[in-house]
Amino acid sequence: MVDNLPVRTHKHRSLTIEGYSRAAVQSYWRVPELRLGFDLGGAPWSFTGNPTVFITHAHLDHMAALPAFVARRRMMKMEPPTIYLPEQVLEATELLLKIWQRLDRGRMNCKLVPVKPGDSIELSREHLVTVFPTKHTVPSVGYLVWERRKKLRPEFVGMTQDQIRDIRLSGKEVSWEVRTPLLGDRKSVV
């Protein structure tokens, strides 16, 4: 693998957080186990396999490597990536990619998905991302990755599996969804 940009690694339980951030220079992070990344101020070769990227805002230190990332995935014959970004920057980003396509003479295939605070994005049965508002000098959003699990409702605890199955088959919901934010090395404060 080409070692072209600095990457720091932090393990948190079963997840790895890799990337680098230096204000006004570059910011790029990924969680390889979830196959997703955050921001593309740089695009280390090791990040090329991430099919999903969430862009927080359009400052260059967070988005300058978008064309290189998209082109690299094309060159490696990978599926076009899905890029989530603030809805206010969608049109300009589409134009940017069209210009790069013309300059590079290579297609800039990717799925650009505009987001706004309050949106939820399903990653898998176990994980979802919610979009929240942030304050910055340009349109921006933040992203929170949630792990979700089904828990048996308290009123059914102590029943046999057959009893619970019969209740579920009668149409009654026997479980509820528990969401836990993936906070890296921080704890939530309520």
Regions found by a protein language model. Name each.
Residues K116-V190:
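Metal-dependent phosphodiesterase/nuclease catalytic metal-binding core
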